[in-house]
UniProtKB/Swiss-Prot annotation:
Family: Belongs to the class-I aminoacyl-tRNA synthetase family. MetG type 1 subfamily.
GO CC annotations, alphabetized: cytosol
Residues that hold ATP according to the record: 335
Known partners and oligomeric status: Homodimer.
Main location: cytoplasm
UniProt function note: Is required not only for elongation of protein synthesis but also for the initiation of all mRNA translation through initiator tRNA(fMet) aminoacylation.
Keyword annotations from UniProtKB, A to Z: Aminoacyl-tRNA synthetase, ATP-binding, Cytoplasm, Ligase, Metal-binding, Nucleotide-binding, Protein biosynthesis, RNA-binding, tRNA-binding, Zinc
The protein's name in its UniProt record: Methionine--tRNA ligase
Organism: Histophilus somni (strain 2336)
Amino acid sequence: MSTNSRQILVTCALPYANGPIHLGHMLEHIQADIWVRFQRMRGNEIYFVCADDAHGTPIMLKADQMGVKPEQLIADVQQKHMADFNGFNISFDNYHSTHSDENRELVEAIYHKLTQNGFIKTRTISQLFDPEKAMFLPDRFVKGTCPKCKAEDQYGDNCEVCSATYSPIELISPRSTVSGATPVLKESEHFFFDLPAFGAMLTEWIRSGSLQQEVANKMQEWFEAGLQQWDISRDAPYFGFKIPNTDNKYFYVWLDAPIGYMASFKNLCGKKSGIDFDSFWSKESHAELYHFIGKDIMYFHSLFWPAMLDGASLRKPNNIFVHGYVTVNGEKMSKSRGTFIQAATYLKYLDPECLRYYYAAKLGSRIDDLDLNLDDFVQRVNTDLVNKLVNLASRNASFIQKRFDGKLANKLDDKMLFDEFIAQSELIADYYENREFGKAIREIMALTDKANKYVDEKAPWVIAKDESRTDELQQVCSMGIELFRVLIGYLKPVLPNLAARAEAFLNTQLTWENVASPLLDHQIAPFKPLFSRLDMKKIEEMIEASKIENAKANQTAGKSAVENKAFSEFEPIEESITIDDFCKVDLRVAKVLKCEAVPESNKLLKFILDIGNETRQVFSGIKAAYGKPEDLEGRFVIMVANLAPRKMKFGMSEGMILSAGNGGADLYLLDVDAGAKAGQRVK
């Protein structure tokens, strides 16, 4: 094992301070925490920091809706976020806020450095302005059609379908999400970061080989499309940091948010002696810096952030570790189905170690979505952790306690088997290092099977009946406990609570290095239950609780929108129609026979539908919302059956499938209750 201690700084993306943590957030934080805990076990000097992203118009407007100041809102949300992360054993060394003195100082220092180096430009721009609310509209408060791929209902800064970035004025048919009004153009002087000046540096960074291949490929696409100067300013009213020497200009939240990584670390340096800020962030730093993020914010972290750091003469990250989204039972998390589960709700019903283990068992180093299949969740946790792992300890501990007063044997019964377990240490370590947690879990569980096979073949319950085999009984049961100890050591980064209980039982502390040292002639503590079975009834209760909580949240949001009329995600109701108008639309239940992605399109899925007496081919722009189209096969949808066929580039579309949502990844197919049949008319 390596004896050279590495200096490492790890961050997670900053949760936005206007809403709760959910199980989608937890994927990233669990992934990072496992990696951090592994590095600590290896003896490396590692710091793990995060913060709340606490600026921007959404926070300003939500605070206004609630009748509180933004500072009060973000303080309350931060306490809830920290409680959720603590509940899931996320071992941050520091959790801070972007609305802090450290962040303000760093933001202004980096801005001044970029200005001195000639990377900040100013020019007057035409900006969208809400005539009803008398305010300039931030990017995320304008929606319209993407100018690149023509996907509808996209935000004003980037497209969730094709990942393109653009100016809000480039949107086709824009509308204000604050009032629903059509915005008008109004001039304003803005500040820009000269991103194109860093093209050569970013190209070299892509080719370094350190980035995930999917990230490098996507960056290459963005380069080919051309880098644009980045607007880093926003007009008042805005909740954030004011740009120095201006009256009503503020830093865009995406400028100060990643600097929040630095601010949280600087705050830690002020609280804990012996940590040097510059040794981690200076241009000459030899420390390692890694960001764990979701694929939805890849653009900002892979282009703007390294360019900002380079322009301010600071070091760049060694790597950006990008993960996919969480789905539940093969579908997007749904508030109506109760699968949009808040972290706090989960903690009321289930052990956080169960989710940590399940996520780890399915996580790899690629940017693949992870499906939380609830049936598989129960089976895997109960089989692996209860039936195999914990049972290995319990079936041997009782003999050691009753017959030998808790004393382990003074030699190994099967040294070859023990050596085989230790020999896997570096392979498992390599899997952890490279974030191939699923592969690590598979290796560990394969060893668990071998350990149980050893106990089954030795049959200590048979040996115990023969008084002449007392020494053999002690050695066999001690061997079983030794193998359990090694396995728990390997799983400690994933299951810190279980590991702590096991350490108390084993009367020892587990490090990666001492896993190889057997506990010979060692006193252990009386065995206590280490882990409880996962109960599907508890999951069902959690789902029902989530439905109720989400419904209440929607009612509160709806009431606030009506009372304050400050902000609404929903489109205004269209003009009234007559019943005769509605009856012209023939809505039918359709069964999905086949569904596949259209390779040449960024947003289309191709459906073959059974509508009772015939089949139809329909193209639907929901690709971003349903990443595994084959999973839709066999389910029922609602379609407009009498819509005139439309000839498209990829074939004839013979109808329209109905879905709800804001567009892009935020779309949900309409369901029908059990019993409905293909071809039935919707009335």
